[in-house]
Amino acid sequence: DDLKSPLDEEERSRIQVEENYTLIILDIPTIEERKGKEYFYTIPFGIIFTDKYIFTVCLVDSPVLTVFMDGRVKDFYTFKRTRFIYQMLYRNATMFLQYLKIIDKKSDEVEKKLHISQRNQELIEMLDLEKSLVYFTTSLRGNEVVLEKLMRNTSIPRYEDDEELLEDVIIENKQAIEMAKIYSDILSGTMDAFASVISNNLNIAMKFLSVITIVLTVPTIVTSALGMNVRGIPFANNPYGFWIVVGISLLMTLAAGAIIAKNKHFK
C-alpha cells in the first residue's frame, strides 16, 4: 500500500516511520502539454528508505532524478544514502524555483498581449497561471511541514554535512513559498486591473451607443410628426417642405448633440 501511495495524484505530503523503512512523500512540480499549451501542476513523489536500499516512486519519469542519472550533481555517491535523499529534496526545491520563474515570464508575455487585444483567451491563460501558483503554494507548504518533521526525525541517520544540506533545502523551500505568494499577488492584481479596464471600456461603449440612439431619435420624431397624412401639417403645401423638414431635423439633431457634449456625457 505504501508503494502505491505516491501513485495517487491526491496523496498528501507526509513522512511515515515504520519498523523496517521510512516513507517520505512530497509534491514535485511538473509540466503537462495539452493542445499546444503548457500547464503547471504538482504530483506526489515517494522516497522509501530502508536499511540497505532507497526506492523512489512517481507517476511519471521525474526530472528530480534526471540530473543524478546524467551525472550533473556534485558530491553524489550512492553509498551516501542520507545525503542522496537530501540532494533529491534540494533538487525538488530548486525545480519549484525554476518553474516559478517560467510562470512569471509567461504571465509577463500574456500581460503584453492583454495590452493589445484584451481577448478572453489571454484572460483564461492568466487564470490558468494563477491556478498553477495556487497548486504550487499549497504543495510547497505541505513540503515545508515534511521537511520540518524530517529535521526532527531520527529514523534516518544524519551527519553534520547532511544537516547543513537539509537546512539549505528548508531555506530554498521557504524562498519558493515566498516567490509563489509574490507572483500570485501580482497576477491577481493584474487580473483585477484588466477586469476594471475591460468593464470601463464596456461602460464607455454602452454610453456611446446610448448617445447615438438619443441623437438619432430626434430626426425620427421630427420626420414622423411632420410626415403624417393629415390636414394642417406645416409645410404640406410648400414646394420646399421636404428640405425644410430635413433642415429642422438636422438643426435639432445638432442641438441635441451639442447639449449632450456640453453636459460631458462622453466622459
Located regions from the model:
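Hydrophobic alpha-helical transmembrane segments and their immediately adjacent juxtamembrane loops
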Residues: K174-K267
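Peripheral, non-transmembrane regulatory/ligand-interaction domains of membrane transport proteins
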Residues: D1-R152, I156-Y159, L165-D168, E172-M179, ...
